[in-house]
């Protein structure tokens, strides 16, 4: 499929190569026999969640784009529509997980969440495993009504031979809040795009994301927060590690449109480079169609500081242990937001394994 994905809302100089995802990030062609059945999935739905027969009729596009959204809906081999009634607060997280393998190499999921007025819920999505040319493609749509609080945690622990697409679309009501935690640690190709529409007053969107790119990995991200209601707030913060010949593009857009009086938006990225052959590109963008707004963006790129490394080694740490310490410091704020302890431990172990593998290389 050759559709344009992860399009920057306002294009910049073409030579920068950040206006949209590269050709290597394109969605896969649909096999003649289809993608086959989904892998065996584990679903944990605490009391208070209801399964619906159908999702939303119309919805805002994700960060990846409307064409990709339509493709994901059409080709999904696993569909889950969830709803929580007005005033219901659910303390235990719902967990949806899948594991790719040779027999079931493709997981294409379509998930919708309808959080009614003053409800509260947490949804955890996990994908693991891998298969040659395996595909993990996910579209999640969240509607948070007035006063609702929704937390979405997405953890990707795929092998390097799999490919990953993760699209998120969010609509918030008055005083609603959606928090997204996105952890992308594997897959040879990882394409993610989140788009939140804060068109009601006092809506809030928070994104905490981490990524790990190694070898010849291709990582492409596009996160957008659209503000039209007044007193809206978004916080988008990303931390990443790149090694080998990994190629990464991150687009972060805060779009203040007319009517977004007293809107506030902050975005930042902190990248640690372990190799001189990586390619790291970041395109922070703040669009202002309203005067009384506050927007800030920051990007930090660093390598292993030789002085810090010497200090840590003088305290008895090996270089591999020092690397792990520096990565842990960057990833910990996001990992700590995973509400399932066993999954937090699994993520930490996966990060350590990937770092050890890089140090051996």
Question: Residues of each region from the PLM?
Answer:
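Short, Gly/Pro- and small/polar-rich lid/capping loops
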Residues: 1-39
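Generic N-terminal initiation segments characterized by hydrophobic and/or small/turn-forming residues
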Residues: 2, 42, 49, 93, ...
